[in-house]
Amino acid sequence: MSSLPRRIIKETQRLMQEPVPGINAIPDENNARYFHVIVTGPNDSPFEGGVFKLELFLPEDYPMSAPKVRFITKIYHPNIDRLGRICLDVLKDKWSPALQIRTILLSIQALLSAPNPDDPLANDVAELWKVNEAEAIRNAREWTQKYAVED
């Protein structure tokens, strides 16, 4: 860990000592810039009861550039495509070095509670979300049961 910037060490320590409710982020034992993340589907959302695996990677120039984050678990969501890429302003143009790993994880958790079909990455999902929200929510619940609920 000594070759890591102090900021990454501090953020990692804080994540371990003060975990975010519903989120578990563990640094990889071979690469402290890579995190194995588990996000629990928020209550009262179509993703409730789901356990979603994500990967988070801090690029060499972090915090000048945003972390790279993607869902590994399949999810039916207008802002997350089939490859797990996430459409979230703080991961793109709204990124600021003042933000931290925990801010990003909280933003992703909030995105699960409030999908935004007006800024989609998965156009087909967003379209259904706009024209028949009830069916889209049903699909999201089905995918959650199928892909994100541990037996």
UniProtKB/Swiss-Prot annotation:
Keyword ATP-binding belongs to the record: yes
Keywords, sorted A to Z: ATP-binding, Nucleotide-binding, Transferase, Ubl conjugation pathway
Record flagged with keyword Metal-binding: no
MF-aspect GO terms: ATP binding; ubiquitin conjugating enzyme activity; ubiquitin conjugating enzyme binding; ubiquitin protein ligase binding
InterPro entries for this protein: UBQ-conjugat_E2_core, UBQ-conjugating_AS, UBQ-conjugating_enzyme/RWD
Pfam families: UQ_con (PF00179)
Reactions this protein catalyses: S-ubiquitinyl-[E1 ubiquitin-activating enzyme]-L-cysteine + [E2 ubiquitin-conjugating enzyme]-L-cysteine = [E1 ubiquitin-activating enzyme]-L-cysteine + S-ubiquitinyl-[E2 ubiquitin-conjugating enzyme]-L-cysteine
One record GO biological process: postreplication repair
Pathway(s) the chain acts in: Protein modification; protein ubiquitination
Official protein name in the record: Ubiquitin-conjugating enzyme E2 N
